[in-house]
């Protein structure tokens, strides 16, 4: 049930995100949430998530290295309004439709619904954390997001996959080593924790930029 992970260039990711955030707000958002008002916000998230999930990396050391969890965590913490959760969820849903087709799977797999539910849980965690300035809170939220996602999705794999014994031992196997013959589940968890930490701090940095610090923001304001 595990999907091959993706990785994307950090410079491209952070640059594009700061461009969209420069459109979405015109003042430092450190003290309040951001309300994304531009349709480009939805388009940007579609590009970000879709791009990150379509770049395969065959080396198992990087499986599950993705910004997706960080996007939902930061969206919950710093964005408000209906777009704060519908935009990233639509991006995941649309990219999943194409990924499932590429892997020869049905367009609407039960696993797809479970992952979307997991993302909403992480979004709720971000709402609970809020736009904190304390990096320790953000780090805790990032680690908690990765662990929650791992437990929810691996537990569903344990239920749905006949390769697992339906016992406590089988559940622990799903959480730790996974299905025999495949990359161990703990590798996915490790990379999920590292990537969520990395991209959460990257997104937090991008959001904290003042308009004058964002490329071309001064030119846009002057015009």
Predicted regions: what they are:
Residues 22-31, 212-223:
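Short, charged juxtamembrane terminal tails flanking transmembrane helices
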Residues 52-64, 90-128:
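Interfacial aromatic-anchored transmembrane helix boundaries in multi-pass membrane proteins
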């Amino acid at each position: 049930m595990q999907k091959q992970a993706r990785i994307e260039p950090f410079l491209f990711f952070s640059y594009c995100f700061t461009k969209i955030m420069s459109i979405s707000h015109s003042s430092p958002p450190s003290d309040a949430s951001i309300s994304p008002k531009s349709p480009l916000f939805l388009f940007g998230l579609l590009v970000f998530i879709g791009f990150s999930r379509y770049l395969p990396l065959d080396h198992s050391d990087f499986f599950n290295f993705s910004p997706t969890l960080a996007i939902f965590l930061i969206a919950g913490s710093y964005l408000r309004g209906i777009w704060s959760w519908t935009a990233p969820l639509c991006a995941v849903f649309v990219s999943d439709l194409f990924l499932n087709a590429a892997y020869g799977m049905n367009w609407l797999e039960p696993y797809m619904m479970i992952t979307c539910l997991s993302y909403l849980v992480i979004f709720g965690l971000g709402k609970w954390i809020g736009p904190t300035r304390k990096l320790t809170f953000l780090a805790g939220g990032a680690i908690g997001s990765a662990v929650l996602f791992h437990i929810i999705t691996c537990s569903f794999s344990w239920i749905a996959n006949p390769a697992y014994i339906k016992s406590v031992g089988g559940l622990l196997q799903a959480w730790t080593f996974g299905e025999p013959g495949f990359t161990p589940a703990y590798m996915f968890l490790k990379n999920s924790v590292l990537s969520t930490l990395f991209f959460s701090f990257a997104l937090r940095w991008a959001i904290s930029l003042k308009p004058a610090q964002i490329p071309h923001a001064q030119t846009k304001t002057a015009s």
